[in-house]
């Protein structure tokens, strides 16, 4: 029994020593299901930066629902960079003066180094025969999703369902609102974040389907095994983007602008793009996307700009206080 505190104190010493010998420390505030991609990315960047500059970096992560994360940054969490799954979350920080107004022009691809798609995770054998969005709104179905007010994952689910309904014969905003209302009624709860939704579905065994990022399916396979679930690609789904930005006020205060800039730029390097692909995120690099084509089925997608006039407009219409989500959820 005496060995336990000894080992623990040794771990603390190691952590303190790691921090003490670092030339700089960066904090990346990110969305909930980005844990794995940055767990792999950070050591790669540390090695690259050491070779390039001679500096040792300590890299820290903070994960949670994307909207909660940016609110934490606005409230004083000193993140050097934000890596999110909704452009309007970064716009929120820009409006607060923490991020540059033209943040989306600071990096390629509107500052989104990779993409994904919203998919359904169902039980092995697909016992409820779920094939498309219409099935998720059927009576008696249980659907696990994160909270659309607080998470990019939840918003992307909501907007994907809305867009699908609009594209149906005779589709209108009225019919889309009615359809999404039916789907939301089938959610027994709203998870706090994407990883919480996965835990609810896989460990707590709640729900008939989990709606999440395509990349999350690989994490589920690694943690729970491929034998317990199947991935269903709906007939239409959102191409999700993952915008990144420097938190200017923080990097200028800490003197870490150079390191933070390089940290984000490296996401577009061959190594950074390969890491994204290995974590089942669709890389921007065309050659790598072709190399990993077998794990990325062709799927009909739309962008939030095409269907909703951009993430900020979608937020104002659907997710601000009193928006369509609140109207639907009150009815729920």
List each model region and its residues.
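N-terminal signal peptide c-region/cleavage motif recognized by signal peptidases
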Residues: 17-21
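Ligand-binding pocket segment of bilobal, Venus flytrap-like solute-binding proteins
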Residues: 168-235
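Extracellular/periplasmic juxtamembrane helices and adjacent flexible linkers that interface
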Residues: 251-332
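Bacterial N-terminal signal peptides that target proteins for export
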Residues: 1-9
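A bilobed periplasmic-binding-protein/Venus flytrap-type ligand-binding module shared by bacterial periplasmic
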Residues: 117-126, 241-258, 275-279
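Short beta-strand->loop
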Residues: 29-31, 122-124, 142-169, 183-187, ...
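Short helix-loop capping/hinge motifs at secondary-structure junctions, enriched
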Residues: 125-131, 150, 163-171, 250-258
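N-terminal segment of the mature folded domain
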Residues: 23-151, 291-293, 329-332
């Amino acid at each position: 029994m005496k060995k336990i505190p000894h080992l623990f104190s040794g771990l603390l010493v190691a952590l303190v020593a790691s921090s003490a010998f670092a030339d700089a420390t960066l904090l990346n505030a990110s969305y909930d299901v980005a844990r794995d991609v940055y767990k792999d990315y950070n050591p790669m960047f540390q090695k690259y930066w050491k070779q390039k500059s001679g500096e040792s970096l300590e890299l820290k992560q903070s994960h949670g629902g994307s909207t909660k994360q940016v609110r934490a940054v606005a409230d004083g969490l000193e993140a050097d960079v934000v890596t999110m799954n909704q452009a309007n979350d970064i716009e929120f920080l820009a409006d607060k003066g923490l991020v540059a107004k033209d943040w989306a022009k600071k990096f390629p691809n509107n500052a989104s180094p990779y993409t994904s798609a919203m998919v359904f995770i169902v039980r092995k054998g697909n016992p409820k025969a779920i094939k498309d969005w219409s099935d998720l709104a059927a009576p008696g179905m249980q659907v696990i999703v994160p909270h659309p007010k607080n998470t990019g994952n939840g918003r992307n689910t909501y907007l994907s369902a809305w867009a699908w309904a609009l594209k149906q014969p005779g589709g209108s905003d009225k019919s889309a609102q009615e359809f999404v209302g039916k789907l939301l009624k089938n959610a027994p709860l709203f998870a706090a974040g994407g990883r919480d939704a996965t835990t609810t579905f896989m460990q707590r065994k709640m729900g008939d389907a989990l709606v999440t990022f395509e990349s999350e399916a690989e994490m589920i396979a690694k943690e729970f095994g491929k034998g317990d679930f199947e991935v269903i690609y709906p007939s239409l789904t959102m191409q999700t983007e993952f915008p990144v930005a420097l938190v200017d006020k923080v990097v200028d205060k800490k003197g870490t602008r150079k390191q933070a800039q390089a940290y984000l730029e490296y996401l577009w390097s061959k190594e950074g793009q390969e890491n994204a692909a290995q974590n089942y995120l669709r890389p921007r690099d065309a050659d790598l996307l072709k190399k990993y084509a077998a794990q990325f089925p062709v799927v009909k997608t739309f962008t939030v700009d095409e269907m909703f006039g951009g993430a900020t407009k979608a937020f104002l219409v659907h997710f601000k206080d009193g928006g369509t989500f609140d109207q639907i959820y009150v009815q729920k």
